[in-house]
Design a protein with these regions (language model features):
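Catalytic "initiation/cleavage/transfer" segments centered on a nucleophilic residue
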Residues: 182-209
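Signature for HUH/AEP ssDNA processing cores
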Residues: 2-12, 19, 23, 29-155, ...
Length: 209
């Protein structure tokens, strides 16, 4: 009888070990399937691409600017889009307009400070000869930056923030970077606060084909 009880206890122990191994294997299989699905996600729908673009570059959705070029081509610039010429009845930015920008049909710019006086990025318009000095300063701070040439052939350096910050902090952070790099540059945002009457500077959106 004692031997039978010991044998039964041993079987129960083995059963528990086997069940634990089964659970462990099931979890490993589930993790591998999830990892495989994530790795297979190499293509995105049109709306997903636009959402990614917006998450990076669009500082505010309620106001945006569009490039205007005179008929003779001598004058051009970005101006806020409004319903009339009153100047304050701004038209919100839509996915349709962003798609048109990405297709090269229109040329848009975003304002760098949102309606809550927050910023999601800082950017610099620098001379080509200063890019190495700026990059050295960014490297020393552990900051990753992205470079592009805008439609005016100016070098733009984008630094994306992990989360939106008060524009005052973002502006002073940008000034700190320039001081550390010992360079001068046009800064986005170019002020600490924005109001409806004074929106702050806008920056040309990239990836315009």
């Amino acid at each position: 009888m004692i031997n039978l009880k010991k044998k039964l206890e041993a079987l129960y122990t083995q059963k528990e070990q086997i069940e634990q191994e089964i659970k462990s294997l099931e979890q490993q299989i589930e993790d591998e399937l999830l990892k495989s699905q994530q790795e297979q996600k190499t293509t995105f729908s049109k709306d997903e691409k636009i959402d990614i673009f917006k998450s990076l570059f669009i500082a505010r959705n309620d106001i945006y600017a569009k490039k205007w070029v005179s008929q003779d081509g001598n004058k051009q610039g970005f101006y806020p889009v409004t319903r009339t010429f009153r100047g304050e009845d701004f038209i919100p930015l839509t996915n349709k307009e962003i798609e048109a920008h990405l297709r090269g049909l229109v040329h848009l710019a975003t304002y760098c400070i949102d309606s809550h006086n927050n910023s999601k990025f800082v950017a610099f318009e620098i001379l080509d000869e200063d890019k190495f000095k700026l990059q050295i300063a960014l490297n020393s701070l552990g900051i990753r930056a992205y470079y592009e040439l805008n439609s005016y052939n100016s070098l733009i350096v984008w630094v994306f923030l992990e989360a939106s910050l008060p524009s005052k902090i973002a502006y002073n952070f940008a000034q700190f970077i320039l001081k550390k790099a010992n360079v001068t540059a046009k800064v986005y945002p170019n002020k600490e606060f924005a109001t409806k009457a004074s929106l702050g500077n806008n920056i040309e959106l990239p990836l315009h084909l």
